[in-house]
């Protein structure tokens, strides 16, 4: 279809502005398709992908959530949703690592630590639901295990570690 054509052309283009133009056209066509099929989770997922690629993370989050609403077993939508949430982590970690040892820096470090933990906590329900839908998804299990480790939820960390070991034999 026309939307697929635009995304393929954009993927094959070496020209950044041309690629952006085709991706915008793809996005417009996906938005039009949603007006005709408003409960199609795949359309929302595609909009999430394009929004994420364009740095529109708030829109991407909403589109992924809508994709899951209409297609609750959509593994890729859960994975991408968590990835977008965790996208904010690197800037937090970078700032944490750049701080010194002054009282002001220690206060800022503690604030950033809370922000980082909040990102992790936001991911937990999506990862848990994803694991319900896809119980052997190692990426989701590892991510959830790591989050539990950072948050100090040792029992949950051990439970997820045991599941991973069971799956991997």
Placement of each model-derived feature along the sequence:
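Canonical positions in the second alpha-helix
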Residues: 32-33, 66-67, 130, 164
């Amino acid at each position: 279809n026309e939307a697929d054509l635009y995304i393929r052309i954009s993927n094959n283009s070496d020209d950044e502005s041309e690629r952006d133009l085709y991706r915008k056209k793809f996005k417009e066509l996906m938005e039009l398709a949603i007006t005709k099929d408003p409960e199609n989770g795949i359309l929302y997922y595609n909009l999430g992908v394009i929004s994420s690629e364009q740095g529109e993370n708030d829109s991407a989050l909403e589109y992924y959530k809508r994709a899951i609403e209409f297609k609750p077993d959509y593994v890729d939508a859960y994975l991408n949703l968590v990835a977008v949430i965790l996208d904010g982590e690197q800037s937090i970690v970078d700032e944490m690592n750049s701080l010194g040892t002054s009282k002001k820096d220690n206060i800022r470090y503690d604030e950033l630590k809370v922000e980082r933990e909040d990102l992790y906590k936001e991911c937990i329900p999506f990862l848990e639901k994803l694991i319900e839908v896809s119980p052997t998804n190692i990426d989701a299990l590892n991510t959830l295990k790591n989050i539990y480790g950072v948050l100090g939820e040792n029992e949950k960390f051990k439970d997820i570690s045991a599941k991973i070991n069971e799956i991997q034999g």
